[in-house]
Amino acid sequence: MLISKTVLSGLALGASFVGVSAQQNSTRWPLHDNGLTDTVEWDHYSFLINGQRHFVFSGEFHYWRIPVPELWRDLLEKIKAAGFTAFSIYNHWGYHSPKPGVLDFENGAHNFTSIMTLAKEIGLYMIIRPGPYVNAEANAGGLPLWTTTGAYGKLRDNDPRYLEALTPYWANISKIIAPHLITNDGNVILYQIENEYAEQWLDEETHEPNTSGQEYMQYLEDVARENGIDAPLIHNLPNMNGHSWSKDLSNATGNVDVIGVDSYPTCWTCNVSECASTNGEYIPYLKLTYPQISYFKELSPTQPSFMPEFQGGSYNPWGGPQGGCPDDLGPDFANLFYRNLISQRVSAISLYMLYGGTNWGWHASTDVATSYDYSSPISENRKLIEKYYETKVLTQFTKIAQDLSKVDRLGNSTKYSSNPAVSVAELRNPDTGAAFYVTQHEYTPSGTVEKFTVKVNTSEGALTIPQYGSQITLNGHQSKIIVTDFKFGSKTLLYSTAEVLTYAVIDGKEVLALWVPTGESGEFTVKGVNSAKFADKGRTANIEIHPGTNNVTVSFMQRSGMSLVELGDGTRIVLLDRSAAHVFWSTPLNNDPAEAGNNTVLVHGPYLVRSAKLEGCDLKLTGDIQNSTEVSIFAPKSVCSVNWNGKKTSVKSAKGGVITTTLGGDAKFELPTISGWKSADSLPEIAKDYSATSKAWVVATKTNSSNPTPPAPNNPVLYVDENDIHVGNHIYRATFPSTDEPPTDVYLNITGGRAFGYSVWLNSDFIGSWLGTATTEQNDQTFSFSNATLSTDEDNILVVVMDNSAHDLRDGALNPRGITNATLIGPGSYSFTEWKLAGNAGFEDHLDPVRAPLNEGSLYAERVGIHLPGYEFDEAEEVSSNSTSLTVPGAGIRVFRTVVPLSVPQGLDVSISFRLTAPSNVTFTSAEGYTNQLRALLFVNGYQYGRFNPYIGHQIDFPVPPGVLDYNGDNTIAVTVWSQSVDGAEIKVDWNVDYVHETSFDMNFDGAYLRPGWIEERREYA
């Protein structure tokens, strides 16, 4: 974009520009509402809530990926503490609907209502995205797996069968959400219809309507409205290739109130090659030039530039690196890319993900394994990583930068800068004249150190800044936002080359926090005051003060930590380096999401500050501490005592409204050793004398499939979903008669999704496995009977155990799972007498509704409940107390189980993860070369919290949260180990403490209701 002529012609006075700009824009951009309420409005610039403009900075988490309702508060408090104004969630139709006509919004984490009440209590706006399709790398994209049979049509269209199937969920979830809308004194501000569904047009250029897609979207909107949803309806387009659902483009059926677009400029997966068709060649930090400005100008010119999903990280696919791919998605990514969005005048952002969580059970799509850490700012084990803090220094700023919610982009050029390697975008509020200059490398992959000055336009004329001090520095993959005419309380910052972090008005005086990395220079000018002094006694100041007639300029070289400058009128300027800014908290004394600067205390030092409350003269703070920490608190002078996590602290100093104290100590916790393992066979089904007559078994009798990919006609339908079986490991048991000229082989064609595998037995003899790969979804293979003994006088029994990785996303949700073709091969003509399939306990009528419907598969150990607390493991064999390994001799499946007590002291947040390893004589190469060919499942108190495929997926650490773990009681740990080789398998299981924090959060909550135990009915599924 060309730089504004106003700037090029000498940077004319801001005052004259402001008047013209305001006049033009007041007539150009209409203010919209949805015709039902004006509580939430919007225009070209931003959203308005209750008449006040907001820069909406949000982030996503999924309650169904952390199935402990008590921990949702922990996450929301961490989101609030960082300065986010909002958060977003997907709901999950499949999680709430185990079978047609059945909905569960009550059991355990299925009851998500507390999230909405917490949003109100804590003070966060909420964007809710109920689907019915959500993608999210969830199994079938969040659709119920009973819809994947083909019986409901192609899905996500106006097929009456599909609409009838989704209506109970859609109507009920709308009713549940409606009382929590902002129109009903709740905090839900936006309601999303569908997800990344760019299906309004058959032809984008001619706007030939896609009637099916339009009617589908309109149906969802109508049902939502009929059931109480009167908040604005939104939609997120998947990329900038489509132009659907915008009222600015057409009045076509299905339009939503506000349209947005999702963006993953690096890649949505750690395997960046998968994004080449959308993003082009991957070059780290290059994709900053997405044409958001021109795209929004075409798509939604009278609506805010809105990104319902912007890259908060990437998922780790099967075969991806251990621990994910945080390197190119770390603090530098957050610093550079999120400021770049601001430079493009985006005023509503939601990071995907802010907390990723865990694909426990079979929640994952076929693309990913157990971890959904996503390299998010809040890690899978709930730890705040450096990326969180680097994001926080921006979200704290956008929350108090009220003028940022209405800006025009006047230019973007290297001509603002004295250094041609540095580009600057100018944003200016047309009403107030406040401006924001976003600086970054002209060639964004560059990580060089660049120094420069910037030409700015201020209310006091054109300036080149800094005026006195050393030049501004960009060091590496960094961006800086330089403000001019920035309001903080009643004061105005004429300019600052140090970034604004936050401010508060305390006792009628402003406290402004600025930050710049250690060793770099900063300079600021405050209007309306003409003197300043360095207020840190005992510390050497590297600071210059330049008084003016009606302002004062301070130039400084940033030292390590925090310093304080006092202006002549009592205004205080806090100078912070990056590390100090990371732990500098702006904590409101109320729960108003819009609170910006008033009713706030500032706290420097702790790992986390969750809340602040002023009761009389007692200041009560809550939060978390990693170790002994020096803390400074900017609070009213009336404060007479400070309580931290309910305990009165010893105040070292309380001068000038700054209270200093020391908090915490070195908290420690040691885990007991995991021992006392017992073991039993978990594949009795291969034995010839096994009777497949329990309630676990269904006889395959269906001859015609509803799936668009029909199976071979020589057998009944063997797709698991058409037999009411949906997730996990599946067991087929087929019989065929003995003959004089018996078959010599069996041909199998099986589809199970990426990373799936299967093993085959004949008459108890192992005849082979398909080990699987990270990318292969289907395999056909012929297995010889040469290693098995065929029966001469009775039926032969063929057993196939398959690992159903998951259902695919989008249109691929209909891809079948199970056996497409099973054919006996030999000199004669053969057919199977009967096929049976083992289902999970209860099939679609789950015996364990708290953990259902995506937790359990069909292994014997799961069906009878060996993985559950309270199971009497009478058939078990003791594992040697000297053994550090769990072993399976030969090919087969065994279950290992033990019970380990925990006793975590009150006041500690102890994060625990399990580590599974499988020794081999090679590293991660190929399945064939890996000598420990196994698949294992980790169960903790009944929850499947780890899928371990060492030769395919490289995840070895599996965090398990409190609530799933009993922190003050016995914990049932079970591991099923499936050896896919005659050589047998060996696995090692251990656990580790990831971190220990002193916390105000009650981790000793009663989570027993989340861990229901074994019931007698399980025996019926043996």
From Swiss-Prot:
Signal peptide: 1-22
Pfam families per record: BetaGal_ABD2, BetaGal_dom2, BetaGal_dom3, Glyco_hydro_35
Keyword Nucleotide-binding listed: no
Chain sites annotated for binding substrate: Y90, N135, A136, E137, N195, Y264, Y374
Highest taxon of source: Eukaryota
E.C. no: 3.2.1.23
Disulfide bonds: C270-C325
Compartments it resides in: Secreted
GO MF annotations, alphabetized: beta-galactosidase activity
Active site per database record: E196, E309
Main location class: secreted
Residue ranges that the Swiss-Prot or TrEMBL entry lists as coiled coil: none
SMART domains noted in UniProt: BetaGal_dom2
Protein keywords: Carbohydrate metabolism, Disulfide bond, Glycoprotein, Glycosidase, Hydrolase, Polysaccharide degradation, Secreted, Signal
Any one GO BP annotation for this protein: polysaccharide catabolic process
Matching InterPro entries: Betagal_dom2, Betagal_dom2_sf, BetaGal_dom3, BetaGal_dom3_sf, BetaGal_jelly_roll_dom, Galactose-bd-like_sf, Gly_Hdrlase_35_cat, Glycoside_Hdrlase_35
SUPFAM superfamilies per record: (Trans)glycosidases (SSF51445), Beta-galactosidase LacA, domain 3 (SSF117100), Galactose-binding domain-like (SSF49785), Glycosyl hydrolase domain (SSF51011)
GO CC, one annotated term: extracellular region
Family: Belongs to the glycosyl hydrolase 35 family.
Function: Cleaves beta-linked terminal galactosyl residues from gangliosides, glycoproteins, and glycosaminoglycans.
PANTHER family: BETA-GALACTOSIDASE RELATED
Protein name (Swiss-Prot/TrEMBL): Probable beta-galactosidase B
Gene: lacB
